[in-house]
C-alpha cells in the first residue's frame, strides 16, 4: 500500500513539473506574438528546459563558437 502511495505522489509531482514546462513552451511560441528573447530564455531556464526560440539558439551557438575560437591558441 505504501508503494502505491509513493508512486501516486511521484506521478502528481511529475505532472505538475511537465505542465509548467508546457505552459512555458506555450508562452514562448504562443499565438499572441513572440515575447522578448530574454523572457523566453528566463522562462525555459526556470523550467529546466532549453527554450524554443530558434533564432536565439543560433545566436547563442554563434557567440559560443566565437568565444571558443578566441580561447584556442593559434599555432
UniProtKB/Swiss-Prot annotation:
It is found in: Secreted. The keyword Cell division does not apply. GO terms for molecular function: toxin activity. Expressed by the venom duct. Keywords: Cleavage on pair of basic residues, Disulfide bond, Neurotoxin, Secreted, Signal, Toxin. Disulfide bonds join 24-28, 37-40, 41-43. Residues 24-50 form a propeptide. The keyword Membrane does not apply. One of its GO terms (cellular component) is extracellular region. It comes from the Eukaryota. Residues 1-23 form the signal peptide. Probable neurotoxin. The cysteine framework is XXIII (C-C-C-CC-C). This is Conotoxin Im23.5. It comes from Conus imperialis (Imperial cone). The lineage of its organism: Eukaryota, Metazoa, Spiralia, Lophotrochozoa, Mollusca.
Amino acid at each position: 500500500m505504501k508503494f502505491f502511495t509513493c508512486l501516486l505522489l511521484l506521478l502528481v509531482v511529475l505532472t505538475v513539473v511537465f505542465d509548467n514546462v508546457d505552459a512555458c513552451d506555450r508562452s514562448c511560441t504562443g499565438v499572441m506574438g513572440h515575447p522578448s528573447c530574454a523572457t523566453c530564455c528566463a522562462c525555459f531556464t526556470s523550467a529546466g528546459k532549453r527554450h524554443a526560440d530558434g533564432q536565439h539558439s543560433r545566436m547563442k551557438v554563434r557567440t559560443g563558437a566565437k568565444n571558443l575560437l578566441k580561447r584556442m591558441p593559434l599555432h
